[in-house]
């Protein structure tokens, strides 16, 4: 049943109907559409459109429909309704007859769909925060179990300075903390109810929109009807948050792929998250991580598509806005799946501590410690930097690590070097000295783990 047929003398062509109809994807808003309709029925009582008995009859029927939807949401797709609003109204009329035709009084599909998608987005934020929190918890657990696994830290994908695997894990905990915070911020900005804004100019019925907002779980009612029905900021903001978080997850996945490679051999991924080759029997491919990395582009594409869709739209509602749903549905589903899979990847990960330590000992990653040692001896840092650079060139030439050079060899470059240089050049010393807040010293890493555990516990 179309909701707009009276103006037309011909039926819509089936080709247009197939092109125009949105039930095949907006059926996912069924619960929100029904809950919004219950709220609107109560508002109509307050302005005399419905009696209390009529409202109660409508609410009972809507609640019955809600139970049916929750038990089998896919059944909606068997209908040929134009959209989820048409479907709900037709099913309501089937249950209560002509009384169901009164429910849309004073309401437009424009404010109705704006409400539905906001309610859906709010629910998704909560679920996504749980998923972010759970991945943080798994990273913290992995860090706690690998506090003594020393590995090289990288810049430009070249060995730079020693870090611990735990410190690496905690870096991603911090990225996810910002993602969690952005979700909370986005929730606060979308917590305004557009219902009662009508098509664009507001409803002609003097409903108490603040009470309506509270009934539907919002903090307050929107302030401008034009903005209310055309606002898709909350979708774009969620897509932006999802995209940035997927960038974080993609970097995590890329690190894991590198660490898992035969060349690095820092970690071994479980058989449960890897696959083989149809040709090469020896292969064990990090498919879970590669898919996370690949899906980042898909989510970012949804953000780009939505921004381009709305950038030139005049106020207020335009049918272009129907394109908001498939992108946000797919992007948030994908993000949630990737958060869950990243946590699963960490469940059975094995860190090759001997290999990571061996790699940390190579690449002259203790060169900065030697420069700091010279500074402590009174050499200006810029000079010490140059001296150590020359020393590294020499060490490479003679195939030695800095810690393997003799005092005589050191003194070819600086006569202030003494026997006390050797403890400074050890991996443990390199870690221990980085003891400022946020540093890689074991003490600071342990503090970071404890702090993160407290923050995660508070999110429950």
Curated annotation (Swiss-Prot):
Keyword check for Transport: no
GO BP terms: arginine biosynthetic process via ornithine; L-arginine biosynthetic process
One of the record's GO molecular function terms: argininosuccinate lyase activity
UniProt superkingdom: Bacteria
PANTHER family reported in the protein's UniProt record: ARGININOSUCCINATE LYASE
Predominant cellular place of this UniProt entry's protein: cytoplasm
CDD domains: Argininosuccinate_lyase
Protein's UniProt name: Argininosuccinate lyase
Enzyme Commission code(s) on record: 4.3.2.1
Reaction(s) this enzyme catalyzes, per UniProt: 2-(N(omega)-L-arginino)succinate = fumarate + L-arginine
Species in which this protein is naturally found: Mannheimia succiniciproducens (strain KCTC 0769BP / MBEL55E)
GO-annotated cellular components: cytosol
Pathways involved: Amino-acid biosynthesis; L-arginine biosynthesis; L-arginine from L-ornithine and carbamoyl phosphate: step 3/3
Keyword Cytoplasm found: yes
UniProt record similarity statement: Belongs to the lyase 1 family. Argininosuccinate lyase subfamily.
Gene from which the chain derives: argH
Localization: Cytoplasm
Pfam families in alphabetical order: ASL_C2 (PF14698), Lyase_1 (PF00206)
Keyword terms: Amino-acid biosynthesis, Arginine biosynthesis, Cytoplasm, Lyase
């Amino acid at each position: 049943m179309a909701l707009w047929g009276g103006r037309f003398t011909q039926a819509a062509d089936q080709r247009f109907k197939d092109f125009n109809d949105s039930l095949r994807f907006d059926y996912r808003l069924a619960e929100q559409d029904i809950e919004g309709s219950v709220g609107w029925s109560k508002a109509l009582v307050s302005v005399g459109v419905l009696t209390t008995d009529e409202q109660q009859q409508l609410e009972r029927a809507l609640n019955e429909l809600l139970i049916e939807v929750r038990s089998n949401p896919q059944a909606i797709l068997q209908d040929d309704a134009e959209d989820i609003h048409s479907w709900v109204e037709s099913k309501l009329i089937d249950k209560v007859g002509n009384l169901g035709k009164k429910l849309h009084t004073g309401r437009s599909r424009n404010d109705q769909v704006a409400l539905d998608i906001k309610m859906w987005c709010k629910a998704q934020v909560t679920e996504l925060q749980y998923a972010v929190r759970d991945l943080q918890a798994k990273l913290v657990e992995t860090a706690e179990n690998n506090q003594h696994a020393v590995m090289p830290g990288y810049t430009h994908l070249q060995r730079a300075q020693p870090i611990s695997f735990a410190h690496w894990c905690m870096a991603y905990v911090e990225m996810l903390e910002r993602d969690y915070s952005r979700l909370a911020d986005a929730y606060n900005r979308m917590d305004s109810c557009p219902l009662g804004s009508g098509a664009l100019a507001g409803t002609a019925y003097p409903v108490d929109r603040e009470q309506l907002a509270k009934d539907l779980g919002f903090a307050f009612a929107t302030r401008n009807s034009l903005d209310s029905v055309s606002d898709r900021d909350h979708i774009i903001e969620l897509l932006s948050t999802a995209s940035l978080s997927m960038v974080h997850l993609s970097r995590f996945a890329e690190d894991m792929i590198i660490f898992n490679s035969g060349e690095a051999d820092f970690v071994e991924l479980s058989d449960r998250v890897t696959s083989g080759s149809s040709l090469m029997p020896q292969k064990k491919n990090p498919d879970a991580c590669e898919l996370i990395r690949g899906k980042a582009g898909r989510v970012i594409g949804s953000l780009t598509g939505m921004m381009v869709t709305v950038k030139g739209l005049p106020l207020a509602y335009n049918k272009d806005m129907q394109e908001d749903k498939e992108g946000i549905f797919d992007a948030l589903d994908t993000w949630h799946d990737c958060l869950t899979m990243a946590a699963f990847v960490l469940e059975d990960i094995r860190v090759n501590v001997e290999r990571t330590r061996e790699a940390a000992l190579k690449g002259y990653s203790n060169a900065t410690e030697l420069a700091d040692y010279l500074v402590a001896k009174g050499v200006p840092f810029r000079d010490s930097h140059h001296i150590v650079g020359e020393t590294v060139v020499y060490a490479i030439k003679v195939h030695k690590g800095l810690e393997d050079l003799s005092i005589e060899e050191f003194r070819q470059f600086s006569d202030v070097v003494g026997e006390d240089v050797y403890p400074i050049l050890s991996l443990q010393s390199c870690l221990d000295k980085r003891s400022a807040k946020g540093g890689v010293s074991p003490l600071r890493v342990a503090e970071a783990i404890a702090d993160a555990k407290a923050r995660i516990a508070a999110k429950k």
